[in-house]
């Protein structure tokens, strides 16, 4: 069945050269010149990586603080007690607790975007693997969401730190902001994301790590981005 595209989408795709790899700043300028949607679209960088997602030693995962934030309101849940719990509340976490929150999550509570836990809390939080795991919400030391410094973690997430993880097809997609952002802000966020993904290259990866990069917005066509300036010699 053929996909029916909107008039706006068809007009946008005529402006994009599908054979060209654009410098990041040029790609963002072009994206911003395309017809906007009726809502503030999320702008995303998608990476096709030269790794085998079936191999555990080729997993690509990490975090990236966006210099200009993500434009998204992030709801944070923290599993902690005592001083760490108090610090999380003062830093702005929406939900803070321990056994009460574990029970609440087991009962189906899902009104949060990021979960953080202290190392001491993880022995119990691991019981939520089947609940939080499928949604990508299980706290993990590699993404800075298992930590004693709950205040720092909450502030970083609220400020726009994004997480990324390789999917089963060897792709990584990372939001870099909103369509309403200034071009310079999107460019700086995008550069930070590309650099973070490059640094996350597994030591076991062979050959070209970043095979291609695509910039897109929710309702607009993607365009290829040249990652060469961000690659180490």
Put a short name on every predicted segment.
Residues 3-17:
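Generic N-terminal amphipathic, Lys/Arg-enriched alpha-helix
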Residues 4, 225-233:
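Short, charged, intrinsically disordered terminal tails
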Residues 22-86, 107, 113:
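Translation machinery proteins
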Residues 27, 88, 133, 215:
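Residue-level signature of catalytic and energy-coupling elements of molecular machines
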Residues 39-43, 200-212:
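Flexible, glycine/charged-enriched surface loops at secondary-structure junctions
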Residues 47, 80, 118-119, 176-178, ...:
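Flexible glycine-/small-residue-rich
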Residues 93-200:
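Long, charge-patterned amphipathic alpha-helical coiled-coil/hairpin "stalk" segments used as oligomerization
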